[in-house]
From Swiss-Prot:
It comes from Mus musculus (Mouse). GO terms for cellular component: membrane. Keywords: Glycoprotein, Membrane, Phosphoprotein, Transmembrane, Transmembrane helix. This is Suppressor of tumorigenicity 7 protein. It is found in: Membrane. Belongs to the ST7 family. InterPro entries: ST7.
Amino acid sequence: MAEAGAGFLEQLKSCIVWSWTYLWTVWFFLVLFLVYILRVPLRINDNLSTVSMFLNTLTPKFYVALTGTSSLISGLILIFEWWYFRKYGTSFIEQVSVSHLRPLLGGVDNNSSNNSNSSNGDSDSNRQSVSECKVWRNPLNLFRGAEYNRYTWVTGREPLTYYDMNLSAQDHQTFFTCDSDHLRPADAIMQKAWRERNPQARISAAHEALEINEIRSRVEVPLIASSTIWEIKLLPKCATAYILLAEEEATTIAEAEKLFKQALKAGDGCYRRSQQLQHHGSQYEAQHRRDTNVLVYIKRRLAMCARRLGRTREAVKMMRDLMKEFPLLSMFNIHENLLEALLELQAYADVQAVLAKYDDISLPKSATICYTAALLKARAVSDKFSPEAASRRGLSTAEMNAVEAIHRAVEFNPHVPKYLLEMKSLILPPEHILKRGDSEAIAYAFFHLAHWKRVEGALNLLHCTWEGTFRMIPYPLEKGHLFYPYPICTETADRELLPSFHEVSVYPKKELPFFILFTAGLCSFTAMLALLTHQFPELMGVFAKAFLSTLFAPLNFVMEKVESILPSSLWHQLTRI
């Protein structure tokens, strides 16, 4: 009985809410009926005639001034709306109407009704959004001295932003320094060098750190109580100084490789010494962790130098050995370097083996993983794929798998196809990328465009199918298909990472709000009316009268019908009651 009573109350409440929703129409017709009934006591006809007489006495200059003023106001509103939309990404009028006027008019936010039921889901999605907007180190980043600086010398443009370089400085301080650096003079100098903003000051500090190691220190060794001798001992080389010089001072890849080889000798010695002492305390453990990062970084960059110089097989071997020796250091994403090198060798079976290990649901995805998987599946069918034949006979199983892989990759990063299909021009990739963002798309396409071109028909298949992804995810910011909803923070972060001369790709495309379009149309229309009224006042007057008579013709027709239906003495009968 209690449940039945509660159900009846809910139905009654819903009926009342429904009736209140449409009650304003009843009020509107009631007001119209009362105005018609009270037209004689209120002297509506006399007032209308007075208004029409006043309007007839107005000169065309008044209408010109009126339309000009309204055009000016509409233009000011348009400028303000456009500025607000460019800055905040939404319409001011729309935001005010939704946020303030809608509650006053009885509108209810859908999110508030589901707030208590979806708090856990909201927190999970917020955490996912934060993780997806994290900036990552670009595993395929270029060399500053040998590549980025050469671009600046040729074009006069800076390919790296201050924000990107500042993130690199923070990475260097994290990987290459520790709390005990003050105990070794060279490391203390390098600790300051990584914080230095001026490139020349950093290079000078690296040379200073190497010069300190050239100074021979005398170590007193007592042999007998009556005499002593002096032993000459060389201090260990500073590996991080060689790293900085290889990255920023070397103007060619060959010079950078020589410096990295010197850094490898110094870094390997420091790593072996700290490995033996790592269990003697937290200080030695921190030193060993730092030396491990230095050694891995040097070996990875040496492999990249070999790849740049055309020794691809040697680079693949170095990367495989590095991944076996340090399997837990996933922060460098060495497998992405390995995938690119294997694609250059056209070792597609080895590429598939690497993907089978790293394209796992528990591991963070990347454009390299998703698009490489799509490339392998497209390779099996792309040479014989034809859109006309596929539309007649349908897609085969292999073609369907390839299309699904492309849709998966495009959903993860929708910016990549424009660069692979050369619809947008490429620039040098930044040192940091935002996953699923334009920066990641540039970094991927910069190195992998040649691999897609090498596979016959792969770009044709991509061109025919990539836009179909967007039909599956009509609202990508709210709900995804195979991945989480597309993060809304990518545009802001990419503008910080990419240089100003590059036009950042935005997804999904922001459409101009209705109020901006309406204001623009109103501004243009009133300005045109003001100009025409000023040039042709008599003709515009005739046109205005004809327009108003046509506009009010249906209302006059309805009023005549109402007068013919209702008796003329109805008002007197109502007053008698």
